[in-house]
């Protein structure tokens, strides 16, 4: 069990010695920290680095809802304590938020001029004051930072784990489910406090509520990605050379559409509660005057009485002005928000369009579409095959999907590693006959190249791909259990590196012929004169008797194991298994393999198929 380090022990001791702190309050703080091993580890690091130097109670009656952090002094001001000395969920959430704020405060970012800048105290203060200004927002963020992705796994990350400055795209904010990170534009939070409160606070309140809901939606979006992966894989593998990915892409975009609509509703609820703190009688008329255009997705002028504001058709507010998450409200908000056409659409004002993405010129279908199409291309290149001598042909109904080739590329088409120099040909079936199109890998350029597309491969930040279900699930779960053990030994929680290690070990285990029934062991190397500790990842199985001990052991460098994303490593394994199956069939038809050397149980001849 991890204990508080010397620095954190000193900080807790100083807190206990304050005249304005009761024994119950000191005990509640200490036990809340010690009850959350991940929080304890992070606070140990903050204290050891000198970024955390003390805790102090808030001023009675005016404590910040979730606490606050002062970068210069390193002091965290705590929210109001609950009665008793036992750990509390509210204090745990506040401490997690403050630990995130400490890391945010001491981070840096690259500005629009490609210059590295440090996060300022104004950025921290404006972010935290926004959270503390809306009880609804404070409650939801507190819930997000204390809700585990997998409640059965004590090492599971929370739904939200990081704040970061946003760069590289036009957006009010983003949430990345791969890293559990909410990113905020420095230009918004970097204002002086007086200017921020006057011009930016309401908008950021909405944005934080919106992005927090994305954190809650990530589980359902992960399921949507798995369904997408299964559907496009089936299309690519079937015996029809025409691979039309329109339907699975459409279904994935529909999931993103619902995700965004729910996030909008949460943004409204955070904002109306902020306004309610200074105007308890807030109504739609008051909301229309608070100085943010975001409310126009929810309300409109009453045509019969232009002095009054009413809900837009299909939207039904509660008596207190909040917006319930009903199917009707979700559907209406999806139409008013997600379905807006892209910026620059003739005849429409800026408020009637959407301008997001790297260039700020994209609508939502193309923003999410870039990632969906990139993902489909990856599976197509891994599994598509000629049928009766006919080469595979990728098809998309661009009009049905509301896609524009140029906007897809502006948002970023990513071609699989090792194949980026080969553009992806597709056929647009919305025309008769279908029109040939070309998508190029344009990472870093974000430019459309005539006559065919070219752009940077930014995956949609709100919903990056998750790992698909895999046929060798039982073996994979055994390996993941072993990797959890390695993580625990290293004092770290599960993260993307853990996924990469697991997928690499699965590929290596499959090549060696290991199965889920084997007693598998895992370890990193210990330090030697030539190697530092942890440079080599070992795997072996016990209980097998063989004259060849090497048959039961395998290893690879940790660098190699971490080099490839889990999805790509799993795709490599499936291709390897397909190749092996084909070789076995050929061997059965042609007789024994005549090659002198065998590798990992299969004939060791070269293949020109590159898996990704």
Which residues make up each language-model segment?
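Extended non-globular interaction regions in eukaryotic gene-expression and organellar proteins
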Residues: 399, 460-548, 565-585
């Amino acid at each position: 069990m991890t204990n508080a380090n010397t620095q954190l022990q000193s900080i807790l001791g100083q807190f206990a010695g304050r005249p304005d702190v009761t024994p119950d309050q000191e005990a509640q703080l200490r036990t809340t920290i010690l009850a959350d091993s991940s929080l304890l580890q992070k606070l140990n690091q903050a204290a050891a680095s000198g970024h955390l130097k003390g805790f102090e109670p808030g001023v009675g009656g005016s404590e910040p809802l979730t606490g606050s952090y002062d970068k210069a002094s390193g002091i965290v001001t705590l929210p109001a304590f609950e009665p008793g000395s036992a750990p509390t969920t509210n204090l745990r959430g506040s401490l997690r938020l403050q630990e995130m704020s400490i890391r945010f405060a001491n981070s840096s970012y690259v500005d629009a001029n490609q210059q590295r800048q440090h996060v300022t105290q104004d950025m921290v203060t404006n972010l935290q004051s926004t959270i503390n200004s809306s009880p609804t927002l404070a409650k939801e963020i507190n819930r997000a930072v204390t809700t585990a992705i997998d409640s059965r796994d004590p090492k599971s990350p929370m739904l939200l784990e990081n704040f970061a400055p946003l760069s590289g795209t036009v957006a009010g904010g983003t949430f990345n489910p791969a890293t559990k990170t909410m990113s905020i534009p420095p230009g918004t939070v970097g204002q002086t406090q007086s200017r921020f409160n006057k011009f930016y606070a309401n908008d950021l309140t909405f944005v934080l509520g919106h992005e927090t809901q994305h954190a809650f939606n990530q589980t359902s979006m992960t399921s949507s990605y798995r369904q997408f992966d299964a559907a496009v894989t089936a299309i690519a593998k079937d015996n029809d050379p025409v691979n039309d990915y329109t339907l699975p892409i459409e279904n994935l975009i529909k999931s993103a559409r619902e995700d965004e609509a729910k996030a909008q509703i949460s943004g409204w609820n955070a904002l109306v509660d902020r306004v309610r703190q200074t105007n308890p009688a807030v109504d739609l008329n008051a909301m229309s005057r608070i100085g943010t255009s975001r409310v126009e997705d929810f309300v409109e002028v009453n045509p019969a009485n232009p002095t009054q504001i009413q809900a837009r058709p299909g939207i039904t507010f509660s008596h207190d002005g909040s917006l319930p998450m009903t199917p009707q409200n979700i559907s209406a908000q999806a139409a008013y928000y997600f379905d807006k056409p892209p910026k620059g659409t003739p005849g429409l004002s800026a408020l009637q369009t959407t301008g997001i993405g790297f260039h700020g010129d994209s609508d939502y279908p193309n923003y999410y579409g870039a990632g969906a199409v990139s993902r489909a291309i990856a599976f197509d290149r891994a599994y598509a095959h000629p049928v009766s001598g006919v080469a595979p042909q990728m098809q998309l109904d661009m009009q049905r999907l509301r896609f524009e080739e140029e906007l897809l590329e502006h948002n970023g088409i990513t071609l699989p590693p090792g194949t980026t120099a080969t553009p992806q040909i597709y056929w647009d079936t919305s025309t008769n006959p279908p029109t040939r199109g070309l998508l190029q890998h344009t990472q870093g350029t974000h430019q459309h190249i005539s006559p065919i597309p070219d752009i940077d491969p930014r995956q949609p930040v709100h919903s990056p791909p998750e790992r698909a279900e895999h046929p060798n699930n039982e073996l994979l779960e055994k390996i993941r259990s072993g990797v959890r053990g390695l993580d625990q030994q290293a004092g770290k929680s599960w993260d993307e590196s853990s996924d990469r290690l697991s997928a690499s070990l699965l590929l290596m285990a499959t090549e060696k012929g290991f199965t889920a029934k084997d007693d598998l062991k895992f370890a990193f190397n210990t330090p030697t004169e030539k190697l530092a500790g942890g440079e080599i990842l070992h795997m072996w199985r016990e209980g097998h008797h063989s004259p060849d001990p090497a048959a039961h052991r395998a290893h690879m460098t940790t660098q190699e194991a971490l080099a490839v994303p889990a999805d790509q490593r799993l795709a490599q394994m499936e291709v390897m298994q397909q190749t092996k199956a084909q070789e076995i069939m050929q061997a059965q038809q042609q007789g024994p393999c005549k090659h002198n050397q065998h590798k990992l149980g299969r004939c060791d001849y070269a293949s020109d198929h590159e898996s990704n």
